[in-house]
Regions:
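Sec-dependent N-terminal signal peptides
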Residues: 4-13
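Short helix/turn-capping signatures at newly exposed starts of structured segments
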Residues: 16-132, 137-140, 161-189
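Long, compositionally biased
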Residues: 140-159
């Protein structure tokens, strides 16, 4: 009986420890910030050294307040707000391979092929060299109606035909040669 009780205690301790680890890793998913206000975010990330300001966004058409968490580090994440009181998030994005991730399994550095596989359907993308360069269209895949936005970048310089504000029509060989990887992940409410 003592062995059974001891086994139960050990299993309980291990199970609780695993649960705590999962909660901690979820803390740094882009989804963990959804529906939070500025004060709640500061409470969650007290070590974030936030920078705040206002700037022109969306190709210079709208001025929005913003907060940068972990500025100047690989963990930097930009939050733009719908209102000056910072009660409602407009969007969240990051571009470095730090501690942030998406609960979807998509991360900075995910390849074009991996992204298409996670989406369940081949993704399409816009040309490079403008504000929304490399923006992914989910092509009626798993993330079509999600609030997740992803941007691809080529490894190295791409040919001129892959630049501009238009959907890119590329052959599988051209896509492979571009060696596309996720370079920015955004959540937009």
């Amino acid at each position: 009986m003592k062995k059974i009780l001891l086994l139960f205690v050990v299993i309980s301790v291990v199970a609780c420890g695993g649960s705590k680890k999962a909660i901690n890793s979820d803390k740094y998913t882009i989804e963990s910030l959804q529906h939070k206000n500025y004060e709640q975010i500061l409470g969650m990330y007290s070590d974030a050294d936030p920078e705040n300001g206002n700037d022109m966004m969306e190709e210079g058409t709208v001025e929005r307040p913003y907060t940068i968490l972990y500025p100047g580090t690989k963990d930097e994440i930009l939050i733009t707000w719908k209102d000056d009181a910072k009660t409602s998030i407009f969007d969240i994005n990051y571009s470095e391979n730090g501690k942030w991730s998406s609960a979807t399994g998509i991360k900075i550095g995910t390849t074009y092929d991996e992204l298409s596989k996670i989406n369940g359907k081949e993704v399409k993308f816009y040309g490079f060299g403008w504000d929304y360069g490399g923006a992914v269209m989910w092509n009626d895949g798993k993330f079509e109606n999600s609030k997740l936005r992803v941007f691809l970048s080529p490894t190295g310089r791409a040919a001129d035909k892959f630049y501009g504000d238009r959907m890119i029509d590329a052959t599988p060989e051209e896509i492979e040669a571009l060696n596309l990887k996720v370079s920015t992940i955004m959540y937009r409410d």
